[in-house]
Structure formats: structure tokens, C-alpha cells
Amino acid sequence: MDDGVDKQAILDAALAEVIASGIDAFSLERVARRAGVDTTVITRNWGDRRVLLLDAQLSSSAQRVPIPDTGSLRGDLMALVQSMVALSQTAEGRRSMHRFLAASGDADLSDVRIDYWRVRLDELTTVLRRAEERGELRDDVDPAEAIRMFSGASLFDVVFADAPVRPEYITQMLDIFIRGISTTP
């Protein structure tokens, strides 16, 4: 980051702006105003709103839903689902998720959503690759496909039913998922 600019402050401002104003109203000018910097600073460092929004979403996810490394498949998946659910239970997390998932007439911002999930799912796949290295994952399980299934099942109620995720659902989903991919019953 050049110009002595606080990158995280701008990313935080970008995330706050998209949550407050929505994805369709998201602009570099609004983020610059919120961050207290000139628009040229943002343009010089990110180029356009698509890149800035993607970077802001990925930065937020990395902080709020870190990739766990507990040393066991069950421990990693439990830590992962707990942080995913915790974020989805906050008002900010729910607003951000719904706005980010909402259909937009803006092709660039639709691409952001696609790029976000491509990058984020690759990061989350680390959990299953580690399990594979420890011999905990069945040979016929594709870690990338399995983490997609896990993520979808983890947040099904939030995304499709607009309801909080129940603890008993998480426990049962995790048990079923692990039985399906693990080398041990």
C-alpha cells in the first residue's frame, strides 16, 4: 500500500458502505468519503469498485471466519461452522450476506460474488486438505467439492429460510458430514 494509507481502514469503510447503502449504490466516491481519503488513493490502490469490494469481503471473511487448525477433522469443522454461524447471527453479518447474495443488475458486482466464493472456498478447502494429509479423509472424497457441500449445509437456514441456525442442527449436520467423508466411523 503506498502513500502511507491505512489499507484496513479503507477496506473497513468499503464493507461498512456496502452494508449501509447496498451493493448497487456502492461506489469509490462513497467509500473515500467514509474513509476520509481522496478517491484517487482508492483508485491507485484498487483500480475499481469491483476489486475493492472483493478485497474488502475477503479481508472481512479472513478475520471473522478464520481457517482453523485444531489438529483434527472434527475440531476444524466444528470451529469453522461455529465461526460461520456466529457471523451469520449478527445483524451486520446477515445484512452483508443477504446483500452480497442478492441478484444485482451490475455484471461487475455479480462477478465479485463469483470471485469471492471461488477464492474463499479454496481457502476453506485447506481444512480438508489438512485432514487428507493426516489420513482422516477417505480417498474418494474431493476436498473442494466436500467443502462446498459443508458450507451450503452449514448456512442453509440462514440463506434459504432467513432463520437462525439451531445448535442441534449443526451437531447433526456435522455428524452426518463427517461419517460421509471420514476414514473412521
Residue ranges and their predicted role:
Residues 1-5, 185:
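N-terminal intrinsically disordered/low-complexity leader segments
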Residues 9, 13, 17-51, 55:
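Helix-turn-helix
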Residues 51, 56-57, 88-114:
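Amphipathic alpha-helical segments used for helix-helix packing
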Residues 57-64:
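Short, basic, alpha-helical segments at the C-terminal edge of helix-turn-helix-like DNA-binding modules
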Residues 65-94:
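Hydrophobic alpha-helical connector segments
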Residues 79, 122-133, 160-185:
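C-terminal peripheral helix-coil segments that are non-catalytic and often amphipathic
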Residues 102, 138-160, 168-179:
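Hydrophobic alpha-helical segments that form the core
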Residues 108-133, 144:
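Amphipathic alpha-helical packing segments from all-alpha helical-bundle domains
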